[in-house]
Amino acid sequence: MSLDHATVRRIAKLARIRLDEEEVPRLAGELNAILGYVEQLAEVDVEGVAPLSGGAQMALRMREDEVTDGRYPDRVLANAPERIGDFFAVPKVVE
């Protein structure tokens, strides 16, 4: 599979990533390299290999749920480019 420049622009638009026109060929090359690697992985014979669901096979401790304010909401919200009250303001992405 190979992505053309129009497809790269469409992916960027859907991901809400602003691309300059000179970035499109470089990004197309990088994405095509990634897709090529994924195609190689699809060709690997995994007959008889048990599926892996996680890296470490250990039991995790459960903890009680508790409602908190995050301990430092003002510091967290200080990173927001825009906020409405105590919430991050984000652009609408679903039409």
Swiss-Prot record:
Family (UniProt): Belongs to the GatC family.
Q: Provide the alphabetized UniProt keywords.
A: ATP-binding, Ligase, Nucleotide-binding, Protein biosynthesis
* Single GO term (MF): ATP binding
Catalysis: reaction(s): L-glutamyl-tRNA(Gln) + L-glutamine + ATP + H2O = L-glutaminyl-tRNA(Gln) + L-glutamate + ADP + phosphate + H(+); L-aspartyl-tRNA(Asn) + L-glutamine + ATP + H2O = L-asparaginyl-tRNA(Asn) + L-glutamate + ADP + phosphate + 2 H(+)
Choose any GO biological process term that the UniProt entry carries and state it: regulation of translational fidelity
Q: What is its EC number?
A: 6.3.5.-
Q: Where do transmembrane segments lie in this chain?
A: none
Q: Share what the entry says about its subunit structure, partners included.
A: Heterotrimer of A, B and C subunits.
Q: Is Protein biosynthesis found in the keyword set?
A: yes
Question: Which HAMAP family does the record cross-reference, listed alphabetically?
Answer: GatC (MF_00122)
Role played: Allows the formation of correctly charged Asn-tRNA(Asn) or Gln-tRNA(Gln) through the transamidation of misacylated Asp-tRNA(Asn) or Glu-tRNA(Gln) in organisms which lack either or both of asparaginyl-tRNA or glutaminyl-tRNA synthetases. The reaction takes place in the presence of glutamine and ATP through an activated phospho-Asp-tRNA(Asn) or phospho-Glu-tRNA(Gln).
Q: Write down what this protein is called.
A: Aspartyl/glutamyl-tRNA(Asn/Gln) amidotransferase subunit C
Alphabetized Pfam families for the sequence = GatC
Lineage runs: Bacteria, Pseudomonadati, Pseudomonadota, Alphaproteobacteria, Acetobacterales
Which InterPro entries does the record cross-reference, listed alphabetically?
Asp/Glu-ADT_sf_sub_c, GatC
> Could you tell me the gene encoding this protein?
gatC
